UniProtKB/Swiss-Prot annotation:
Keywords: Cell inner membrane, Cell membrane, Lipid biosynthesis, Lipid metabolism, Membrane, Phospholipid biosynthesis, Phospholipid metabolism, Transferase, Transmembrane, Transmembrane helix. Belongs to the PlsY family. The chain crosses the membrane at residues 10-30, 60-80, 86-106, 116-136, 166-186. This is Glycerol-3-phosphate acyltransferase. Catalyzes the transfer of an acyl group from acyl-phosphate (acyl-PO(4)) to glycerol-3-phosphate (G3P) to form lysophosphatidic acid (LPA). This enzyme utilizes acyl-phosphate as fatty acyl donor, but not acyl-CoA or acyl-ACP. Its main location: membrane. One of its GO terms (biological process) is phospholipid biosynthetic process. It catalyses: an acyl phosphate + sn-glycerol 3-phosphate = a 1-acyl-sn-glycero-3-phosphate + phosphate. Pathway: Lipid metabolism; phospholipid metabolism. GO terms for molecular function: acyl-phosphate glycerol-3-phosphate acyltransferase activity. It comes from Brucella melitensis biotype 2 (strain ATCC 23457). The keyword Metal-binding does not apply.
Length: 201
């Protein structure tokens, strides 16, 4: 059995590893490499895939979405070699790193893609639940933000119902953070001014 000090150091190391990986601002890197300038200067000022899409480059937005998700997946899977607790710590670190990246003044994305990536790495079946909830909500309401909020709300409930309390607790915390990061979107949804999927601007 590992000593408590070693165990704690391992968890801290996993958290830091995940944070550093999650801090990579792929949206900013890709738009600059494509000659589109600083994505933070357009739209919402966000570095995530939704704002990258506002450049008009769908392929770049898709690449941003995939890479932002893979940050979470990679962090969780690599750390999983040291046990589930390390994987959870690394996944959470990647999520926080995406939200508050050290490289660009701690101003990152809203975390949905990395949330999904961590979910894929820790509980792939939960990722299917997320995808189903997102798609159904998007088809019915046509709001990307609402779809993400509903999907993230369903995940911890689904995980808890399957008896995985540790992961349910992790994603419940992450869901609360996702809601906080989307508070402007929630306000616009309530006011009827949120942009729908496919809308310009």
């Amino acid at each position: 059995m590992a000593e408590p000090g070693f165990f704690n150091a391992m968890l801290i190391g996993a958290l830091i590893f995940g944070y550093v990986l999650g801090s990579i601002p792929f949206g900013l890197i890709l738009t600059r490499l494509a000659g589109l300038g600083d994505v933070r200067a357009i739209g919402s000022g966000n570095i995530g895939a939704t704002n990258v899409l506002r450049t008009g480059n769908k392929k770049l937005a898709a690449a941003t979405l995939i890479l932002d998700a893979l940050k979470g997946t990679a962090a969780a899977l690599i750390a999983a070699h040291f046990g589930q607790n390390a994987a959870i710590a690394a996944g959470f670190g990647a999520f926080i790193g995406h939200l508050f990246p050290v490289w660009i003044g701690f101003k990152g994305g809203k975390g949905v893609a990395t949330y999904l990536g961590v979910l894929i790495g820790l509980a792939w079946a939960g990722a299917l639940v997320f995808a189903a909830a997102w798609i159904v909500t998007a088809l019915l309401a046509r709001y990307s933000s609402l779809s993400a909020l509903v999907a993230s709300l369903v995940v911890p409930i689904a995980l808890y119902s399957r008896g995985n309390q540790a992961l349910a607790a992790l994603f419940a915390i992450m869901t609360v953070i996702v809601f906080i990061k989307h508070r402007a979107n929630i306000s616009r949804l309530l006011n009827g001014t949120e942009s729908k999927i496919g809308a310009k601007g």
